[in-house]
């Protein structure tokens, strides 16, 4: 007896090819880069991303944050239309914060979608949802896809704590977005 397993992303199955095709070329540094931020609607995500964007500009010479969008639903991966907007507006993307099961899975799928479109992406998940993220990476055909992990939870942090977390994760975010800039 066989059972049909449905892909929760609503997309056709992708062959398990590792990270090939899911890893965009990295710039050597962020000087002059246009930064895109994708807010998944979770509490504190936009504050965190905005702080990261500001730090990328002030400390790594990024040209600025050129696009910020908020997803309509944290649990649904972005579509090709959103990816195309980012392709035209930025050079690198930071997205998150995955701090629940469905939003973590969608954040990983979003990062993979950006990468496949040629945009280096730094995805931030909390440590409580690593299995969910890894499962989605496998479903998307990129089982070795990497993201930045932070302590759970994010939603209950004060604004100052969120900013502190952004500063703490900044070196990992820079490393995820670049091929060689020391963090």
Q: Where do the protein language model's features map onto the residues?
A:
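Structural motif
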Residues: 72-84, 162
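Short beta-strand elements in bilobed, periplasmic/extracellular small-molecule ligand-binding domains
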Residues: 58-73, 144-151
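N-terminal amphipathic/basic leader segments beginning at the initiator methionine
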Residues: 1-24
